[in-house]
């Protein structure tokens, strides 16, 4: 399924324009964590610094966040995964997103993805990987998120004004326990706190490389549920199956 972007004239315009230097930033995180609001403030900071950002918003069924970004005067495209995993959809559309960003003569492509699975970390190796997480999800949330957080370069913590200082400190320690190498930014999607710091990291992020690879392997292979099987219980399913006690088996040819 191709990305559905804003009208851009000739479909072939700009293709193969790989000579232009371009940075890629992938922003993922838990639903409702404030990814879009934080990113909008970061876009404003990048614009003030003279950079030309472009945004691709990946969502599941519906979004109007593209209208919010359009008000900032930046190129924006939308991709709806629909019946597919939004992170998988984002991963295999990276080439189209980069082509589109070059057509827009952007300096940096900001890819905001839905990040619903948590186990599917959509970060290529040649990007700045940003995980946005909501502190109100509880002190142990960073330990539950998985590769979405553990392979991120930057973890942006939102809604810190809704909890105590002690809770924020515990949350921070849990993040570092899961990912000791990451940078942590405390952000506020309403006031814009932390946006300038995030924009500075984006400016210093890596340029897009050739033959990019994912930082972490995806979950186990496709099962019959992925291909549309509706019946419950293992007797109706094939592929790699995991039991409640952790035992794994392969069922099928």
Model-predicted segments: where are they?
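P-loop NTP-binding site
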Residues: 23, 27-32, 44-47, 210-253
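Extreme N-terminal, non-catalytic leader segments
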Residues: 1-28
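Conserved nucleotide-binding/hydrolysis micro-motifs of P-loop NTPases
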Residues: 60-63, 115-116, 136-139, 160-164, ...
């Amino acid at each position: 399924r191709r990305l559905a972007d804003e009208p851009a004239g000739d479909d072939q315009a700009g293709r193969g324009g790989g000579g232009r230097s371009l940075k890629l930033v992938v922003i993922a995180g838990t639903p409702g964590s404030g990814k879009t609001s934080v990113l909008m403030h970061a876009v404003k900071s990048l614009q003030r610094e003279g950079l030309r950002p472009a945004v691709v918003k990946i969502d599941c069924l519906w979004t109007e966040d593209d209208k919010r970004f359009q008000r900032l005067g930046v190129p924006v495209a939308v991709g709806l995964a629909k019946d597919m995993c939004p992170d998988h959809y984002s991963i295999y559309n990276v080439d189209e997103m980069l082509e589109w960003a070059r057509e827009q003569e952007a300096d940096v492509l900001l890819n905001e993805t839905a990040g619903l699975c948590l186990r599917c970390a959509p970060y290529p190796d040649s990007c700045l990987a940003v995980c946005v997480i909501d502190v109100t999800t509880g002190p142990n949330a960073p330990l539950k998120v998985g590769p979405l957080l553990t392979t991120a370069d930057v973890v942006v913590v939102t809604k810190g004004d809704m909890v105590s200082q002690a809770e924020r400190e515990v949350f921070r320690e849990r993040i570092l326990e899961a990912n000791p190498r990451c940078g942590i930014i405390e952000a506020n999607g309403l006031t814009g706190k932390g946006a300038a710091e995030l924009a500075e990291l984006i400016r210093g992020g890596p340029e897009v490389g050739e033959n990019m690879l994912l930082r972490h392997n995806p979950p186990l292979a496709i099962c019959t549920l992925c291909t549309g099987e509706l019946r419950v219980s293992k007797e109706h399913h094939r592929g790699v199956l995991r039991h409640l006690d952790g035992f794994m088996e392969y069922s099928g040819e």
